[in-house]
Amino acid sequence: MGAVLGVFSLASWVPCLCSGASCLLCSCCPNSKNSTVTRLIYAFILLLSTVVSYIMQRKEMETYLKKIPGFCEGGFKIHEADINADKDCDVLVGYKAVYRISFAMAIFFFVFSLLMFKVKTSKDLRAAVHNGFWFFKIAALIGIMVGSFYIPGGYFSSVWFVVGMIGAALFILIQLVLLVDFAHSWNESWVNRMEEGNPRLWYAALLSFTSAFYILSIICVGLLYTYYTKPDGCTENKFFISINLILCVVASIISIHPKIQEHQPRSGLLQSSLITLYTMYLTWSAMSNEPDRSCNPNLMSFITRITAPTLAPGNSTAVVPTPTPPSKSGSLLDSDNFIGLFVFVLCLLYSSIRTSTNSQVDKLTLSGSDSVILGDTTTSGASDEEDGQPRRAVDNEKEGVQYSYSLFHLMLCLASLYIMMTLTSWYSPDAKFQSMTSKWPAVWVKISSSWVCLLLYVWTLVAPLVLTSRDFS
């Protein structure tokens, strides 16, 4: 009886799955806007695919993946040069499965990016596809995923690695834009509250977070110099840490320069401290992909060196921690990847709830004139609750879209590639998928993104001085 009731309860959701996004989440957020709800659903789909990709790397999945013709033959063992450890078929096939799932997600969102090009209002028929028909879209996505597992091996993995690295690098730049946007919005919000009332409280809050970010950044610099450099080696790491430290100091000084303050009174050290901390994370992330293991200890080595005695008992021989090989009970998701995924989730959620009306980066880049600024429309949803009809979110895009549908799907396409590279630790496969190694291109992609991050932030500061004819108020 309970099963029957469950079927009828599930059936009641079928109209929602075939209609707009506003029906799916109306019980949780009845007063939300359609533009926000749609983006949250797409973000949830991407996060769900990330969970599935992670599960595919688990050892328990080997039995099922080996049943796919030609996907995993004989549970072969492969030797990985950079960590001196044997990998069973489960780990390598997990990587191959992640590549397939990410391929399906990227194709799905790329096709939608093309389909949604130049959609101006929700009255466009294509907007109905974007905001609705969820059952069919999810079914199509599952179909693409299943089909991707039957793609012949060959050079697919190597080619898709290159595509993934390029896409992931572009998504890192998008994360940087969102981070700068968030930093400016956060600072402006708190400065406004400080001016409205209780200035001491908000000033103390600004000072506390700014100090905390700078202190964490200094700690990061110290740890990186201690564990990722050696007196007689690791020259690249010394250069990466030093140049990024200098650039962060320069960016912080620029943010409080009198000329900058004159044109942007609300620029300050809060944004600089957040950008500095993120730059230090990118520096660490880049060096974590360095092929030379002597210059790239893993996080467990940090803990071992800090907590364990440096001298062996009874003699004066130093205990040298060795890199910890990956566990064969699961995937190789390490601390760097976890932090990367955490930052990814925050940026994805922020991109789903932000609007062009509160975007500070839109004012500080060359895209401000294209932003659609609409007033809040909260009265149109009242009639939906009449006559027992389900409550729906407010359609706030009848006169103009709140964001570019095409660019949003393109961002999710690049995010799929970023997830692929993160879950596989940016390791590079050969053509026959017989080895997985860290490579220098991954290092340079990440370290270059840290420089672009700082350049982008500095540009948002100096733009009013350079583009004098543009309104940044």
From Swiss-Prot:
Question: What positions does the record give for glycosylation?
Answer: 34
Q: Which InterPro entries match?
A: TDE1/TMS
Q: Which Pfam families match?
A: Serinc
Q: Which keywords does UniProt give here?
A: Antiviral defense, Cell membrane, Cytoplasm, Glycoprotein, Golgi apparatus, Host-virus interaction, Immunity, Innate immunity, Membrane, Phosphoprotein, Transmembrane, Transmembrane helix
Specify the protein's topology with respect to the membrane: Multi-pass membrane protein
Q: Which reaction does it catalyse?
A: a 1,2-diacyl-sn-glycero-3-phospho-L-serine(in) = a 1,2-diacyl-sn-glycero-3-phospho-L-serine(out); a 1,2-diacyl-sn-glycero-3-phosphocholine(in) = a 1,2-diacyl-sn-glycero-3-phosphocholine(out); a 1,2-diacyl-sn-glycero-3-phosphoethanolamine(in) = a 1,2-diacyl-sn-glycero-3-phosphoethanolamine(out)
Q: In which tissues is it expressed?
A: Ubiquitous. Expression levels were increased fourfold to tenfold in lung tumor tissues compared with normal pulmonary tissues.
Q: Which GO BP terms, alphabetically?
A: antiviral innate immune response; L-serine biosynthetic process; plasma membrane phospholipid scrambling; positive regulation of endoplasmic reticulum stress-induced intrinsic apoptotic signaling pathway
Q: What is its main location?
A: membrane
| Phosphoserine sites (modified residues) | 371
Q: Where are the transmembrane segments?
A: 97-117, 133-153, 160-180, 204-224, 240-260, 330-350, 407-427, 447-467
Provide the Gene Ontology terms for cellular component.
Golgi membrane; membrane; perinuclear region of cytoplasm; plasma membrane
Residue ranges that the UniProt entry lists as topological domain Extracellular: 1-96, 154-159, 225-239, 351-406, 468-473
Q: Which domain of life is it from?
A: Eukaryota
- Subcellular location, in the record's words? Cell membrane; Golgi apparatus membrane; Cytoplasm, Perinuclear region
Record topological domains on the Cytoplasmic side: 118-132, 181-203, 261-329, 428-446
What is the recorded post-translational modification? N-glycosylated.
Q: Which GO terms describe its molecular function?
A: L-serine transmembrane transporter activity; phospholipid scramblase activity
Q: Which family does it belong to?
A: Belongs to the TDE1 family.
Q: What does this protein do?
A: Restriction factor required to restrict infectivity of lentiviruses, such as HIV-1: acts by inhibiting an early step of viral infection. Impairs the penetration of the viral particle into the cytoplasm. Non-ATP-dependent, non-specific lipid transporter for phosphatidylserine, phosphatidylcholine, and phosphatidylethanolamine. Functions as a scramblase that flips lipids in both directions across the membrane. Phospholipid scrambling results in HIV-1 surface exposure of phosphatidylserine and loss of membrane asymmetry, which leads to changes in HIV-1 Env conformation and loss of infectivity.
Per its record, how is this protein called by name? Serine incorporator 3
